[in-house]
Amino acid sequence: MGWRACLRPEASGAVQGRWLGAVLSGLCLLSALAFLEWLGSPTETAWNAAQGNVDAPDVGGSTPQVPSLLSMLVTRRRRYTLTPARLRWDHFNLTYRILSFPRNLLSPEETRRGLAAAFRMWSDVSPFSFREVAPERPSDLKIGFYPVNHTDCLVSALHHCFDGPTGELAHAFFPPHGGIHFDDSEYWVLGPTRYSWKKGVWLTDLVHVAAHEIGHALGLMHSQQDQALMHLNATLRGWKALSQDELWGLHRLYGCLDRIFVCTSWARKGFCDVRQRLMKRLCPRSCDFCYEFPFPTVATTTSPTRTKTRFVREGRNMTFHCGQKILHKKGKVYWYKDQEPLEFSYPGYLALGEARLSIIANAVNEGTYTCVVRHRQRVLTTYSWRVRVRS
């Protein structure tokens, strides 16, 4: 019941021209199997990095300065995930336009109201602001409600089509593409997702789904925290509010910034202690509420001493095989890129199998790939490949 990802084969307005040819899409919302299963139970540093530090290591920040949070933070593991290339916007004042509206139930005005509510969920807790512009004007984000066959999904293997009612609900593209597509076969409503016995269809909460997809459009992938809005099954579980996990992900991606100019003054007056909820939202930097988990979800690994280097032409598909002869010993395969764990497949970019890893050679995917086969705490074997793309 995982989500698939959409990848735009050509990127315009690219920063770092070579690697944006591989811009990842946001992951897609909900599979039909997940629905059926559920039914069974009725910056400062950010901008420097954005201009070229695409291989910045995924390292946590300093120890938190807030005593009341310390005991919780030192034992938690990082839950949010970012795109492998840490794709992000280079400005906070984003515009959006609505290219088409749903044909079922919601009027254009209701649709606008629902989307605005979803955007407010993010603008209320981040430096981002969102403003709708006319459909004919250029914008950062482009929103539309589309049929099964939409835009280039039939001719592009990297952008899939929708699948009709109650299947995939929506998908979004990572920055700087800005596309957010909703399945027009769904019955969108302003209110909780529920089954309508009168109509015989599922009614889907537009605000909740849109807020999740906006998170992808800002550069966040799925969170592993059960109660996070960016969790894989957030809609199924009914979590509608942004969690601290999303805030840490935004801090990691865009820097931890105060939202108003009086934060320093408020911090001196002791608001960080007596008004923690307000100050976490408005003044995370002045109150030292910024925190990066130093613990990866899977332990990092060092590359083996013997690493094979492969020079390949851009666009070539490559597959690495690992530990096929010893998997009968019940070993488990772990994959890493540049010593950081790979935990998910990204269709059109990277595919993880039990004992193989497939990638498309491009500037984003350059690096050192390592596989480690472990049985409990014992390492059975290790392989490593260094990929370099020919210009």
UniProtKB/Swiss-Prot annotation:
**Domain (ShKT): residue spans on this chain:** 256-290
Proregion residues are 1-79
Hey, which stretches end up on the Lumenal side?
Answer: 39-391
Keyword Magnesium on this protein?
no
At what residues does the UniProt record annotate the site feature described as Cleavage? R79, Y80
**Location(s), subcellular:** Membrane; Endoplasmic reticulum membrane
Q: Which residues form the Ig-like C2-type domain?
A: 296-381
UniProt's post-translational modification comment states: N-glycosylated. Proteolytic cleavage might yield an active form.
The record's account of tissue expression is: Expressed at the highest levels in ovary and uterus. In ovary expression is strictly confined to granulosa cells of preantral and small antral follicles. Detected also in testis and prostate.
Reported regulation of activity: Inhibited by TIMP2.
Q: Where does Zn(2+) bind?
A: H212, H216, H222
Which terms under GO biological process does the entry name? collagen catabolic process; extracellular matrix organization; proteolysis
Q: Which residues cross the membrane?
A: 20-38
Q: Where is the active site?
A: E213
Q: What does UniProt give as the signal peptide span?
A: none
Glycosylation positions in this chain: N93, N149, N233, N317
Q: Does this UniProt record's set of keywords contain Protein transport? A: no
Any idea which UniProt keywords this protein has? Cleavage on pair of basic residues, Disulfide bond, Endoplasmic reticulum, Glycoprotein, Hydrolase, Immunoglobulin domain, Membrane, Metal-binding, Metalloprotease, Protease, Signal-anchor, Transmembrane, Transmembrane helix, Zinc, Zymogen
Q: Which GO terms describe its cellular component?
A: endoplasmic reticulum membrane; extracellular matrix; extracellular space
Print the domain comment field. The ShKT domain associates with, and blocks several potassium channels in the nanomolar to low micromolar range. The relative affinity is Kv1.6 > Kv1.3 > Kv1.1 = Kv3.2 > Kv1.4.
What is this protein's record name? Matrix metalloproteinase-23
What lineage does UniProt assign to this protein's organism?
A: Eukaryota, Metazoa, Chordata, Craniata, Vertebrata
Q: What gene does this protein come from?
A: Mmp23
